[in-house]
Design a protein with these regions (language model features):
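Ligand-binding pockets and gating/stacking loops
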Residues: 1-212
Length: 212
């Protein structure tokens, strides 16, 4: 996360004084012309400042129990395999992001978006899908369980989805002799939802016999 620390020579109290001065100037202008964009600007500056000062504590996982870190899969070994969309410790990053999501919920954040963009399975489906499923399965399950144990799941809707699915038929791309992947399939795909007062164990909708 960028820009959490001030540049050298700018202590927090000086930054706060500068923001207060800027807000006073904007407030004076707002009282004269009542432009709502000025009020929005004041609110945006204040929100940015609060986020900057609150983020270091939020992303510090050192006080989390070892059992919690293990449940999410933080610092677990790489599941092995994969390749497309894999940068560094992808599996650990996703686990930490899920844990950070729970910490954000505890602090009243209303909307949280976690992205894992490695599902472009036009080829090498067997290995790629196995790897990506291994990356996300444990952290997502831990997030839902953690929210439930803390009494936060009923007031939090967890949605796991993508923008489209994959065709039920194979795709041959890149000169492969065999169809090793799946193409885009926006006509039928699934999402998982938990919490938010929803009744669990339900399935809505279905495909025909060949997945359309």
């Amino acid at each position: 996360m960028l820009n959490l620390s001030n540049p050298k020579g700018l202590p927090p109290e000086l930054q706060r004084a500068g923001l207060d001065t800027l807000n006073a100037v904007n407030q004076g202008r707002f009282e004269k012309i009542h432009d709502p964009e000025i009020a929005s600007r004041i609110a945006s500056y204040e929100l940015a400042s609060r986020m900057q000062t609150a983020a270091p504590e939020l992303i510090d996982l050192s006080k989390e129990k070892a059992s919690t870190l293990k449940a999410y899969g933080v610092d677990r070994p790489d599941p092995g395999g994969g390749g497309r969309g894999k940068f560094g410790d992808t599996h650990q990053d996703f686990a930490r992001n899920c844990l950070l999501a729970r910490r954000m919920v505890e602090r009243g954040v209303r909307y949280i978006n976690i992205v894992y963009a490695s599902w472009d399975h036009h080829s090498k489906l067997d290995g790629e899908l196995k790897y990506n499923s291994s990356v996300v399965d444990q952290p997502i399950a831990a997030l839902i369980r953690d929210l439930k144990e803390r009494g936060l799941l009923d007031s939090t809707l967890v949605q796991w989805s993508s923008e489209f699915g994959r065709t039920p038929l194979g795709e041959n791309r890149g000169g492969n002799k065999n169809a090793t992947g799946r193409d885009h399939h926006p006509f039928c795909f699934s999402m998982v939802m938990a919490g938010g007062g929803l009744k669990g164990g339900q399935v809505y909708g279905k495909t025909d016999e060949i997945g359309w």
